[in-house]
Curated annotation (Swiss-Prot):
Organism: Arabidopsis thaliana (Mouse-ear cress)
Protein's name according to its UniProt entry: Cytokinin dehydrogenase 2
UniProt cofactor(s): FAD
Binding sites annotated in the UniProt record for FAD: A87, G89, G91, S93, Q97, D150, T155, S161, I165, I216, Y460, S495, Q498
Protein keywords: Endoplasmic reticulum, FAD, Flavoprotein, Glycoprotein, Oxidoreductase, Secreted, Signal
Modified residues (Pros-8alpha-FAD histidine): H92
Tissue expression pattern: Expressed in the shoot apex, in stipules, and occasionally in the most apical part of the inflorescence stems. Not detected in roots.
Pfam family, one: Cytokin-bind
Family: Belongs to the oxygen-dependent FAD-linked oxidoreductase family.
GO-annotated molecular function: cytokinin dehydrogenase activity; FAD binding; primary methylamine oxidase activity
Gene, per the UniProt record: CKX2
SUPFAM superfamilies: FAD-binding/transporter-associated domain-like, FAD-linked oxidases, C-terminal domain
Glycan-bearing residues: N32, N51, N107
EC number: 1.5.99.12
Length: 501
């Protein structure tokens, strides 16, 4: 009889969940959390945008509040049944960084909210909110964030845990540089508010901290006036030095007479050349140009505005059309709504989805390269590796940004060099499962070339598998990074998919 009472007590106290892969996680009923082991939910949480890895969690929770996450982490840190936890937004990682084998995935998209302050200078945003929804909500009040990633259908928390880069970085810095305050739940389950003045060690740690010190649940994002429209240009170059010289000149110009967005793209003759931005009458000319030269460089810029009749708009257009050294005749301009410009990649996503090409593996390689070595990088990587690849599929981005827009106190890394300008490189290739090893081999060859040539690159959205590589990556920040882990997540529960600790 005593044994029966004990069994009943145990059943009452514990909610025992066993996933389809045989991994068991015990959560006390008092936590009032529902751990889903539905096969479809587990399957979705086992994969990410990279479509390269499969890592199966023990279960997934959809929190109704930040308190749910706090209770989960307190139990994981202090309970008898220790398990690891990973926060996951849209799963836009490339190599399982937001995964946890046998542990618990916290579906951050279950917590969304955008509240604009009365003075419209900032918005308090729940970490599971998509950037596109932040844009929609803030634009209703005539304001918007000042820096953006190219793709807006990703979560605020996930982006800030990595850095957040795009074509506005040269002007306003990465997304992590435009945060005033955060709410974070540490690996001990503590719910803390942090900023540059309050708990700064946590604030600087989690921005670009790869989820190692806590789960961001709220971010206070800087806002400014939301322009109505954008004049969007693309210009073609056949000479790399001329191309980069014009890029660097544009990012050095003052705000009022300069552009608001700048990126660069590389067209390769062994890849797919998207000529759709240009008028139909010019598209065959663009394609022929790429065939003729092998490599063509695309300067892409935008100027935001409200009133097209303002003199400054004409002045900027004159600067672009009359003083830059692009190939004569190879310039195209679109006039689009501000929202449509920022959401442009989603349009391309829908096209790829309709063709069944979105769910392919994405062996992307993202790098920061010092300005002083960008020509060496171009010659050794673009000419001698990418152009000689059997076929290139996807985008190759290359554009400069100003180093002073980054805050070195944050975990986010860029090359530790004494230079004012660094280049952002995005080799955004896709591959069939059959071709994946070839593309991964190309990426390895690129990294090896940079190391052998002494080019002090830093990777972005990286995935290392050895502690030595992580120590090298964080460089002078490693000691602080390691100490912060011991301080805020001493049991190493958070974001194990990064393979750091």
């Amino acid at each position: 009889m005593a044994n029966l009472r004990l069994m009943i007590t145990l059943i009452t106290v514990l909610m025992i969940t066993k996933s389809s892969n045989g991994i068991k996680i015990d959560l006390p009923k008092s936590l009032n959390l529902t751990l889903s082991t539905d096969p479809s939910i587990i399957s979705a949480a086992s994969h990410d945008f990279g479509n390269i890895t499969t890592v199966t969690p023990g279960g997934v929770i959809c929190p109704s509040s930040t308190a749910d996450i706090s209770r989960l982490l307190q139990y994981a840190a202090n309970g008898k049944s220790t398990f690891q936890v990973a926060a996951r937004g849209q799963g836009h990682s490339l190599n399982g960084q937001a995964s946890v084998s046998g542990g618990v995935i916290v579906n951050m998209t279950c917590i969304t909210d955008v509240v604009v302050s009365k003075d419209k200078k900032y918005a308090d945003v729940a970490a599971g909110t998509l950037w596109v929804d932040v844009l929609k909500k803030t634009a209703e009040k005539g304001v918007s964030p000042v820096s953006w990633t190219d793709y807006l259908h990703i979560t605020v928390g996930g982006t800030l845990s990595n850095g957040g880069i795009g074509g506005q970085v040269f002007r306003n810095g990465p997304l992590v540089s435009n945060v005033l305050e955060l709410d974070v739940i540490t690996g001990k389950g503590e719910m803390l508010t942090c900023s540059r003045q309050l708990n700064p060690e946590l604030f600087y740690g989690v921005l670009g901290g790869l989820g190692q010190f806590g789960i961001i649940t709220r971010a206070r994002i800087v806002l400014d006036h939301a322009p109505k429209r954008a004049k969007w240009f693309r210009m073609l170059y056949s000479d790399f030095t001329t191309f980069t010289k014009d890029q660097e000149r544009l990012i050095s110009m003052a705000n009022d007479i300069g552009v608001d967005y700048l990126e660069g793209q590389i067209f390769l003759s062994n890849g797919v050349v998207d000529t759709s931005f240009f008028p139909p009458s010019d598209q065959s000319k663009v394609a022929d140009l790429v065939k003729q030269h092998g490599i063509i460089y695309v300067l892409e810029v935008a100027k935001y505005y409200d009133d097209p009749n303002l003199p400054i708009i004409s002045k900027v257009i004159d600067t672009l059309t009359k003083t830059l050294s692009y190939l004569p005749g190879f310039i195209s301009m679109h006039d689009v709504a501000y929202f449509d410009f920022l959401n442009r990649v989603h349009v391309e996503e829908n096209k790829l989805r309709s063709l069944g090409l979105w769910e392919l593996p994405h062996p992307w390689l993202n790098l920061y390269v010092p300005k002083s070595r960008i020509l060496d990088f171009h010659n050794g990587v673009v000419k001698d590796i990418l152009l000689k690849q059997k076929s290139a599929s996807g985008l190759a981005l290359l554009y400069p940004t100003n180093r002073n827009k980054w805050d070195n106190r944050m975990s986010a890394m860029i090359p530790e060099i004494d230079e004012d300008v660094i280049y952002i490189i995005g080799l955004l290739q896709s591959a069939t499962p059959k071709d994946l090893p070839e593309v991964e081999s190309v990426n390895e060859k690129i990294i090896r070339f940079c190391k052998d040539s002494g080019i002090k690159i830093k990777q972005y959205l990286m995935h290392y598998t050895s502690k030595e590589d992580w120590i090298e990556h964080f460089g002078s920040k490693w000691d602080d990074f390691s100490k912060r882990k011991d301080l805020f997540d001493p049991k190493k529960l958070l974001s194990p998919g990064q393979d750091i600790f």
